[in-house]
């Protein structure tokens, strides 16, 4: 059953308000209805409620129908309501009205006024879209860009959704129906006053409570209410912390101390470890240098391994202090996390908060024992562990190796070629040549088991001796010569003459005899190095010394001419 009003309703513009409903019809008779246009808001009277529809008369030829769902509270027959005219005459000749759009039009007008005055509007974030969020402004949907959500990135946006909160309108476009709002502007304005007030009270040494707002590799930012402070990684604990996330969580409440405040930049440095006494104050007494202790492996680094000395305190064993004989090996290959090892305290640096430890010094240095039993010159037998391009490694016991360089295999033959005649596992005899305790190396030799065949040559051809040499081979870099038909010598190109244009090997012939001075002897090969240039210079100096004291009128040319004549 429906209730219908018999009296016709006369149109009225939305701008006109009447105090009494009973005068409504009479007043409308004098109003010009030609102003009623589509896409405008007008007042209308509810004349009938039928099923799910509200029938409204706005004074036009036809009534309009509006779904009940568009009304927040249902009107009664006779009530005057504001409606939006979609079309004066739509399909079937009916006027198309909307209560929802009328409300939005009214709200849009209110929002425009608030925007022009810079006033805040209440809204609720209810959805996520590309680039930001959607906000319900009591029926009008606005866009909240991601950059305008907060003063800092928010990891969990659900914490600010579906909550009524203030926003500031940044821009409005009625034609496009777009509204852009900001939450960040309000936060900045509200925080600004509180920030200035708090900064005026901040002092170093203050203890404050805050919330972890962001975690980075180098520390965490703590929200102190209206300002943020940085809690650096090194100020979290007196012990070792590899990453802040090991001990801190997002939104975790923490107690911190202001350890530094820069009044110019307004930067606040915070610390947690400063709330406790510095354990390093008593470290030197508790861990004296030379003390032998035990500890567990807690962490590895490229340069060594960390051991736990006690709760919250670690010491470093450098790679070179792990083993006497494996200083270059990866610590991870020698130790495991949680393994308990014995160590000695080497140094305690209270300023840098470092404790240096040694594992190897808890054990006897096997190299010292080897040196005591096998001094330099000792002949030993040892199996071959490995053969490389540059020599042979043999086993000396106690995980210790000795090395025979390829140059110490033979006096006369090529060591590189001789390496092929040895194989892994062969036991060979060799002599201890040198022991380097700093580098932890033992040098051995095979050729030193027999006398140096070139020592006799060194004794016979001493440096400075003038000898006669016969050319046996002409090379680009010099001449190969033979001394006394048994010893090989060599004259470098630059040693062929004291005149540069005569330093040419091709100027000599095979079997030509040359006078030269012994410069040196290669002990590894026994080859004698000679110099024609040095011999000529010595001859010239000798001549000048012999004839230089004669008549001063005699010139150099005369002296040399006389010498040459005498030699003929």
UniProtKB/Swiss-Prot annotation:
GO terms for cellular component: cytosolic small ribosomal subunit. SMART domains: S1. Keywords: Repeat, Ribonucleoprotein, Ribosomal protein, RNA-binding. InterPro entries: NA-bd_OB-fold (IPR012340), Ribos_protein_bS1-like (IPR050437), Ribosomal_bS1 (IPR000110), Ribosomal_protein_S1-like (IPR035104), S1_domain (IPR003029). One of its GO terms (biological process) is translation. GO terms for molecular function: mRNA binding; structural constituent of ribosome. It holds the Pfam family S1. Disulfide bonds: none annotated. Residues 39-100, 118-184, 205-273, 290-360, 377-447, 464-533 form the S1 motif domain. SUPFAM superfamilies: Nucleic acid-binding proteins. Belongs to the bacterial ribosomal protein bS1 family. Binds mRNA; thus facilitating recognition of the initiation point. It is needed to translate mRNA with a short Shine-Dalgarno (SD) purine-rich sequence. This is Small ribosomal subunit protein bS1. The lineage of its organism: Bacteria, Pseudomonadati, Pseudomonadota, Alphaproteobacteria, Rickettsiales.
């Amino acid at each position: 059953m429906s209730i219908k009003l018999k009296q016709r309703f006369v149109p009225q513009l939305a701008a006109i308000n009447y105090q009494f409903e009973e005068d409504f019809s009479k007043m409308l008779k004098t109003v010009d209805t030609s102003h009623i246009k589509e896409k405008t808001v007008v007042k209308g009277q509810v004349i009938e409620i039928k099923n799910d529809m509200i029938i409204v008369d706005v004074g036009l030829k036809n009534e309009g129908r509006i779904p009940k769902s568009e009304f927040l509270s249902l009107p009664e027959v006779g009530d005057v309501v504001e409606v939006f005219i979609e079309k004066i005459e739509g399909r079937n000749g009916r006027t198309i009205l909307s209560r929802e759009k009328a409300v939005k039009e009214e709200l849009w007008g209110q929002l425009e006024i608030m925007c022009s005055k810079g006033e805040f509007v209440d809204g609720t974030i209810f959805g996520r879209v590309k680039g930001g969020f959607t906000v319900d402004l009591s029926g009008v949907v606005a866009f909240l860009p991601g950059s305008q959500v907060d003063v800092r990135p928010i990891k969990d946006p659900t914490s600010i959704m579906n909550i009524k909160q203030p926003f500031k309108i940044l821009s409005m476009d009625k034609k496009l129906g777009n509204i852009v709002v900001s939450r960040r502007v309000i936060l900045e304005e509200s925080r600004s006053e509180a920030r200035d007030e708090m900064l005026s009270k901040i002092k170093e040494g203050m203890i404050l409570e805050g919330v972890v707002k962001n975690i980075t590799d180098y520390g965490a930012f703590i929200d102190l209410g209206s300002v943020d402070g940085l809690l650096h990684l090194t100020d979290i604990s007196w012990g070792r912390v590899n990453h802040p996330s090991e001990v801190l969580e997002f939104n975790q409440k923490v107690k911190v101390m202001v350890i530094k405040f820069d009044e110019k930049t307004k930067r606040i440095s915070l610390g947690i470890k400063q709330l406790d006494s510095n354990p390093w104050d008593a470290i030197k007494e508790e861990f004296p240098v030379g003390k032998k202790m035990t500890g567990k492996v807690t962490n590895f680094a490229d340069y060594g391994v960390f051991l736990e000395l006690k709760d919250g305190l670690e010491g470093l064993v450098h790679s070179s202090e792990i083993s006497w004989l494996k200083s270059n090996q990866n610590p991870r290959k020698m130790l495991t996390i949680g393994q308990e090892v014995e160590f000695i305290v080497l140094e305690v640096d209270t300023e840098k908060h470092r404790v240096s430890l040694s594992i190897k010094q808890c054990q006897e240095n096997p190299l010292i024992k080897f040196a005591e039993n096998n001094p330099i010159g000792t002949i030993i037998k040892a199996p071959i562990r490995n053969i490389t391009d540059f020599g042979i490694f043999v086993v000396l016991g106690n995980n210790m190796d000795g090395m025979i360089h390829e140059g110490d295999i033979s006096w006369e033959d090529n060591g590189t070629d001789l390496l092929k005649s040895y194989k892994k596992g062969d036991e060979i005899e060799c002599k201890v040549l040198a022991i380097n305790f700093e580098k932890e190396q033992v040098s051995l030799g095979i050729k030193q088991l027999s006398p140096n065949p070139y020592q006799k040559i060194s004794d016979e051809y001493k440096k400075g001796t003038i000898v006669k040499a016969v050319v046996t081979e002409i090379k680009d870099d010099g001449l190969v010569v033979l001394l006394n038909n048994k010893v090989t010598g060599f004259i470098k190109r630059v040693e062929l003459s004291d005149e540069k244009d005569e330093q040419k090997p091709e100027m000599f012939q095979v079997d030509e005899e040359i006078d030269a001075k012994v410069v040196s002897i290669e002990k590894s090969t026994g080859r004698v190095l000679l110099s024609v240039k040095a011999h000529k210079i010595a001859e010239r100096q000798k001549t000048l010394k012999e004839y230089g004291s004669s008549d001063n009128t005699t010139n150099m040319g005369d002296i040399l001419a006389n010498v040459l004549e005498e030699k003929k």
